[in-house]
């Protein structure tokens, strides 16, 4: 479904739908998921095990192009999933997802440019759900193959996806002025 929201705040809509926002920390430089806590210190991302508090990885981004958008990451079996995001109109070598093997210090894949600038992404099995859009540019919700970085499919939206939540077989997508609920 698609519903105009009158330019509402994302948290108002998620509260009304009884959803919790994913990976939101108390500070801009820290966030968490069910298994890990992530903390930015300068240009390094420290990854801690939830529960033990043990630091298991320190990821040093090789250039400013390797940048995680705010409060979002995903780590499974030593593979780190993140994104490079630049604010502004489309340009080459920006706004993409990537998978990085932390054990072997190796980039495994990166998605096409302009496939990610939403505030978060959701991993569901072998699919990464994320979005891209900007003023005077096409706005899409993407399905990206988690193993290859290839775009599986995309859904045109009226505005750029902001926050994405998966719950009870539905995908809730907030944009600047529209809210979407998609059976998944």
Residue ranges and their predicted role:
Residues 39, 81-82, 130, 173:
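Residue position within the beta-strands of beta-propeller blades
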Residues 44-46, 95-98, 140-142, 178-180:
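A short loop-to-beta-strand structural motif that recurs across blades of beta-propeller domains
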Residues 39-41, 88-94, 133-138:
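Short, solvent-exposed loop/turn segments at conserved positions within beta-propeller repeat blades
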Residues 10-11, 16-32, 63-76, 113-125, ...:
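Repeated scaffold domains used in trafficking and secretory/extracellular systems
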Residues 1-23, 54-64, 106-113, 140, ...:
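Aromatic (tryptophan-biased) beta-strands that constitute blades/sheets of beta-rich domains
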Residues 59-122:
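Eukaryotic tandem repeat interaction scaffolds
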Residues 50-52, 101-104, 145-149, 184:
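Short loop/turn segments that connect beta-strands within beta-propeller blades
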Residues 162-184:
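Blade-level signature of beta-propeller repeat domains, shared across WD40, Kelch, NHL, RCC1
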